[in-house]
Amino acid sequence: METPLKAPESSLESCNEPSSRTSEQDVATQELARQGEEILSQLYRPLEACTNSCYCKKCCYDCQLCFLQKGLGIWYDRKGRRRRTPKKTKAHPSSASDKSISTRTRNSQPEKKQKKTLEATVETDLGLGR
């Protein structure tokens, strides 16, 4: 009767092993979940100010802000670099922008009529020559 008692004990040990494996897997998945949460928290964390002014390869990849500014050249802040162009003074009072639309179109229409008359004369000349 002793042998049957030992067999169930060994079967219990074999049953305990898979449960220990699953607990190890649970621990591993929990660690991965923590790492994922940490990565996400770093992703959504605002970028910190970096005072490093070096543009070497090591410093360009130092942090996310350095990579964006130095590596990619993206600057989100405006430092007044853009200057507005001064308004142009009108040098000639009779420039094309001062003329009304009807005056400009009136001047361009006679040119079209002249082209049409030239085309008509060319067509008549070709027609007679043949």
From Swiss-Prot:
A motif (Nuclear localization signal, and RNA-binding (TAR)) lies at residues 78-90. Its main location: host cell. GO terms for molecular function: RNA binding; RNA-binding transcription regulator activity. The phosphorylation by CDK9 does not seem to be important for transactivation function. Keywords: Activator, AIDS, Host nucleus, Host-virus interaction, Phosphoprotein, RNA-binding, Transcription, Transcription regulation. Residues 79-91 have a biased composition (Basic residues). GO terms for biological process: positive regulation of viral transcription. The modification Phosphothreonine is found at T85, T89. It comes from the Viruses. Residues 109-118 have a biased composition (Basic and acidic residues). Residues 1-30, 78-130 are annotated as: Disordered. InterPro entries: IV_Tat, Tat_dom_sf. Residues 11-28, 92-108 have a biased composition (Polar residues). The modification Phosphoserine is found at S94. One of its GO terms (cellular component) is host cell nucleolus. It is found in: Host nucleus, Host nucleolus. Residues 50-66 are annotated as: Cysteine-rich. It holds the Pfam family Tat. Residues 67-77 are annotated as: Core. Transcriptional activator that increases RNA Pol II processivity, thereby increasing the level of full-length viral transcripts. Recognizes a hairpin structure at the 5'-LTR of the nascent viral mRNAs referred to as the transactivation responsive RNA element (TAR) and recruits the cyclin T1-CDK9 complex (P-TEFb complex) that will in turn hyperphosphorylate the RNA polymerase II to allow efficient elongation. The CDK9 component of P-TEFb and other Tat-activated kinases hyperphosphorylate the C-terminus of RNA Pol II that becomes stabilized and much more processive. Extracellular circulating Tat can be endocytosed by surrounding uninfected cells via the binding to several surface receptors. Endosomal low pH allows Tat to cross the endosome membrane to enter the cytosol and eventually further translocate into the nucleus, thereby inducing severe cell dysfunctions ranging from cell activation to cell death. Through. The Arg-rich RNA-binding region binds the TAR RNA. This region also mediates the nuclear localization. Belongs to the lentiviruses Tat family. Interacts with host CCNT1. Associates with the P-TEFb complex composed at least of Tat, P-TEFb (CDK9 and CCNT1), TAR RNA, RNA Pol II. Interacts with CCNT2; the resulting complex is unable to bind to TAR RNA. This is Protein Tat. It comes from Human immunodeficiency virus type 2 subtype A (isolate NIH-Z). The gene is tat.
